Each structure stands twice: as C-alpha cells, then as structure tokens.
A protein has these predicted regions:
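Positively charged, polar, low-complexity stretches
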Residues: 1-99
Length: 99
C-alpha cells in the first residue's frame, strides 16, 4: 500500500470521527496477541480506532508507527490518546472504504 495522500487521509479522519475505539492499549503495550487482534480487526473493518490508556509507557506516535508496521497498515491520525489505523481488505470485492 502506498502512502496516503492528504485528501485520502482527510476522508479517513472524517469517517473515523464517528468510530468508537475498539481496542485499548495499556501497560502490556504491543504484545503479539494484541498485534494479531489488531490485524484481524483491520481485515474485517479496514479502519479502526485504538484508545491509548494513561498507564501505557512509550510515545504514542512511535507505538502507532510500530503497530502499523507490524500489521501492514497506515497511520491515519494520532490525536490525544487515540490512534487511527487503516488497511484495505485483501479481497477488492469486500472493501468497504474506497478512496
């Protein structure tokens, strides 16, 4: 997947505004199980929001980049304690979001 353009990123941010976080990143940080769960959620939903808890150690931007790298996703936005990730579904017929 190529980098997102500013127009694509803007559209995804608009969609993400109405999403509730479906994961919470806490003290345990980026475990293999957490990464696998994120990967599975991205396959089903394409766009997800993650809540970073106060007890989570580390820089939110670095965590977002690491998570995106491990799941082959793109970081749409890191704002406050929220991370938004995007990845197209592998099957083009099942894609829900077209950019």
């Amino acid at each position: 997947m190529t980098d997102l353009t500013s127009k694509e990123r803007s559209r995804l941010k608009g969609i993400a505004m109405n999403l509730d976080p479906i994961f919470q990143l806490g003290k345990e940080s980026l475990t293999p199980e957490f990464t696998k769960a994120i990967d599975e959620a991205l396959e089903k939903r394409e766009l997800i929001k993650i809540n970073v808890l106060k007890n989570c150690d580390g820089d939110k931007n670095a965590l977002a980049e690491t998570l995106a790298e491990r799941t082959h996703a793109k970081v749409v936005q890191v704002i406050g304690r929220k991370i938004v990730l995007f990845r197209y579904q592998k099957d083009p017929k099942k894609r829900k979001i077209e950019l």
